């Protein structure tokens, strides 16, 4: 009997503790869109990306032209010349693939530039969210932009504007 009473009290206390926890959410996309430095960084990244995409695309166009030229002239070329042209095409294609990887690979220039420009802003946002969570005694703050399965969120629990204010941006 004592065990049942102790267990009941434990369940009752833990249910009260669970009910006392506060939850809120932010929309990190909304926050970032309202920070001019983030928008400027994103524009710079987009500009670089387009520039690099054009460079890679132009390189592949050169390879394509080399291949078409080779196909048209192959009947006139000696075996030695065919081999040299094939090697030149393969070498050029490898150069372009390496260039593409250099710009857009996992540790590529675009990734590094994004780390340089965007990460400090994201770190500031995260710091502000953590400060608000501590000040407001929130147990959990969700991000609705992260693609989680939040089917409904009451706007009164949205702390996005509070985060922007903490970062010094009026909205």
List each language-model region with its residue ranges.
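Positively charged n-region of N-terminal signal peptides that target proteins for export
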Residues: 1-4
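Bacterial N-terminal signal peptides
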Residues: 7-15
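Sec/Tat signal peptide C-region and signal peptidase I cleavage site
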Residues: 16-20
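Amphipathic alpha-helical segments
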Residues: 21-136, 140-148, 170
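Short, exposed beta-strand-loop hairpins at the edges of beta-sheets
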Residues: 151-153
């Amino acid at each position: 009997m004592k065990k049942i009473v102790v267990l009941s009290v434990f369940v009752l206390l833990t249910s009260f503790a669970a009910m006392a926890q506060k939850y809120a959410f932010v929309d990190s996309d909304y926050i970032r869109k309202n920070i001019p430095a983030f928008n400027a960084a994103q524009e710079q990244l987009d500009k670089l990306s387009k520039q690099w995409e054009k460079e890679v695309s132009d390189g592949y166009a050169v390879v394509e032209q080399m291949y078409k030229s080779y196909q048209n002239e192959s009947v006139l070329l000696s075996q030695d010349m065919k081999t040299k042209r094939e090697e030149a095409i393969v070498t050029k294609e490898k150069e372009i693939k390496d260039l593409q990887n250099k710009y857009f690979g996992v540790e590529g220039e675009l990734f590094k530039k994004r780390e340089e420009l965007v990460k400090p802003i994201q770190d500031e946002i995260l710091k502000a969210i953590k400060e608000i969570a501590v000040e407001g005694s929130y147990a959990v703050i969700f991000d609705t932009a992260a693609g989680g399965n939040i089917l409904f969120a009451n706007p009164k629990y949205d702390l996005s504007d509070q985060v922007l204010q903490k970062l010094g941006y009026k909205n």
